[in-house]
Amino acid sequence: MAILFAVVARGTTILAKHAWCGGNFLEVTEQILAKIPSENNKLTYSHGNYLFHYICQDRIVYLCITDDDFERSRAFNFLNEIKKRFQTTYGSRAQTALPYAMNSEFSSVLAAQLKHHSENKGLDKVMETQAQVDELKGIMVRNIDLVAQRGERLELLIDKTENLVDSSVTFKTTSRNLARAMCMKNLKLTIIIIIVSIVFIYIIVSPLCGGFTWPSCVKK
């Protein structure tokens, strides 16, 4: 389960975006953005196995796409965080910005927050207040039909292969680092055991050799 795609837009004008994996996100997002009214609103659209969550405030839309089994509370926590960071960074500039004007800067913020909110499953239990729970109850979920320009039914197509490859590389790197760390830990433990053994033998043998300088055992 993960947040698959996130976008910040003014109406249908995309200002910044980030995708967790490959897919026809932009084609689908354009259809969704065209259906979102300009007044302040929060809503979840349901389409197939995916959910489209959005917050619209001051004509700026903060939208993300998730699997249908991804917790809505986590999705809206993500959107609220993105909204706060975007408003703090750009303010009123977003009202007149050109398409993708903030993408070079803000896409990295989307990527970092997308990863953070996707991986931290305990986030809701820590951050979510009763007010947020009540707010979530008021956010409706609506089914939506998407139609491509050619009139055919539009489906969200996702290619997670690239992400799986990245995950495999990350897993191998993590495994190597873990093996290296375990090797160093075992080496340190071996050295400590050897030192302790030498000290122990020295303490045992010293009385038998007449003291700590071993006068009776060391020939002059």
Swiss-Prot record:
SUPFAM superfamilies the record matches: SNARE fusion complex, SNARE-like
Entry GO MF terms: SNAP receptor activity; SNARE binding
Cytoplasmic side of membrane: 2-188
InterPro entries: Longin-like_dom_sf, Longin_dom, Synaptobrevin-like, Synaptobrevin-like_transport, V_SNARE_CC
Residue ranges of domain v-SNARE coiled-coil homology in the record: 125-185
Tissue: Detected in all tissues tested.
Keywords from the UniProt entry: Acetylation, Coiled coil, Cytoplasmic vesicle, Endoplasmic reticulum, Endosome, Exocytosis, Golgi apparatus, Lysosome, Membrane, Phosphoprotein, Protein transport, Signal-anchor, Synapse, Synaptosome, Transmembrane, Transmembrane helix, Transport
Cellular component, GO, one term: membrane
Topology in the lipid bilayer: Single-pass type IV membrane protein
Modification type N-acetylalanine: residues: 2
Residues of the Longin domain: 7-110
GO terms of biological process kind: calcium-ion regulated exocytosis; endoplasmic reticulum to Golgi vesicle-mediated transport; endosome to lysosome transport; eosinophil degranulation; exocytosis; natural killer cell degranulation; neutrophil degranulation; phagocytosis, engulfment
Ranges in the topological domain labelled Vesicular: 210-220
Chain ranges passing through the membrane: 189-209
Family according to the record: Belongs to the synaptobrevin family.
Additional comment: The gene coding for this protein is located in the pseudoautosomal region 2 (PAR2) of X and Y chromosomes.
Assembly: Component of the SNARE complex composed of STX4, SNAP23 and VAMP7 that binds SYT7 during lysosomal exocytosis. Component of the SNARE complex composed of STX7, STX8, VAMP7 and VTI1B that is required for heterotypic fusion of late endosomes with lysosomes. May interact with STX17. Interacts with PICALM. Interacts with RAB21.
Known function: Involved in the targeting and/or fusion of transport vesicles to their target membrane during transport of proteins from the early endosome to the lysosome. Required for heterotypic fusion of late endosomes with lysosomes and homotypic lysosomal fusion. Required for calcium regulated lysosomal exocytosis. Involved in the export of chylomicrons from the endoplasmic reticulum to the cis Golgi. Required for exocytosis of mediators during eosinophil and neutrophil degranulation, and target cell killing by natural killer cells.
Protein name from the UniProt record: Vesicle-associated membrane protein 7
Organism: Homo sapiens (Human)
